[in-house]
UniProtKB/Swiss-Prot annotation:
The keyword Nucleus does not apply. It comes from Rhizobium meliloti (strain 1021). This is Flagellar basal-body rod protein FlgF. NCBIfam families: FlgEFG_subfam, flgF, PRK12642.1. It comes from the Bacteria. InterPro entries: Flag_bb_rod_N, Flagellar_FlgE/F/G, Flg_bb/hook_C_dom, FlgE/F/G-like, FlgF, LlgE_F_G-like_D1. Keywords: Bacterial flagellum. It is found in: Bacterial flagellum basal body. Signal peptide: none annotated. Belongs to the flagella basal body rod proteins family. One of its GO terms (cellular component) is bacterial-type flagellum basal body, rod. GO terms for biological process: bacterial-type flagellum-dependent swarming motility. SUPFAM superfamilies: Flagellar hook protein flgE. Pfam families: Flg_bb_rod, Flg_bbr_C, LlgE_F_G_D1.
Amino acid sequence: MQTGLYVALSSQMALEKRLNTLADNIANSNTVGFRATEVKFNQVLGDTKPTKVSYVSEGEEFLSTKTGALARTGSALDFAIKGDAWFSIDTPGGPALTRDGRFTLTETGELVTIKGYPVLDAGGAPIQLNGGAGEIAVGADGAIHQNGVQIALLGLYEADFSKGFMRYDNSSVMPAAQPEPVVDRFDVGVMQGFLEESNVNAIQEMSQLIMITRAFDNVTALMRDSEGSLDKAIETLGGSR
């Protein structure tokens, strides 16, 4: 009977984790460059004889690789990335990756995010431009030109998020594994004058949220019933002495 409680508890913990990720996804359905968090669950077998009992793992989080819709803005300092790559930014918590390409220039010409975090080049250094040196043009390879002269290169990075990651400021993420600059990949490029919208389908996520909430309530009710049955069994056994 206790085994049933353990199985229900493992299911409840897994469902709670999925509820939290769904709620976070929905909250960021309008966040530029946001990538949804998904959860993969595995079946864990308990070595109980004479039969094996299946438990639900707590779940492993991973980032959705689906690209969000592209929105044309026409701004010279708005950028979207084509393909599986990220911009690198220097946050107070350390370097982070983002697909939110809403950039601007400081008074000194440093390229920063709308929150003021420096945007980094392929070498991990801040990008310095001249705000008064003419039109800014950025090629698909990330090369930044002013008056026909290349003066900087937007850093594009790839990372293995399967080794773990943490969120930073909604659309930014910090992978556990060291990101590497993108080299010789023709499927990756920069699009100037565009932004990538969140890849969250709010309607789909809401539907899943309702389903998971119902499942969570059902498991909770099952646990209460199991606990009640266990109490009655203990009471009966105790009274038979």
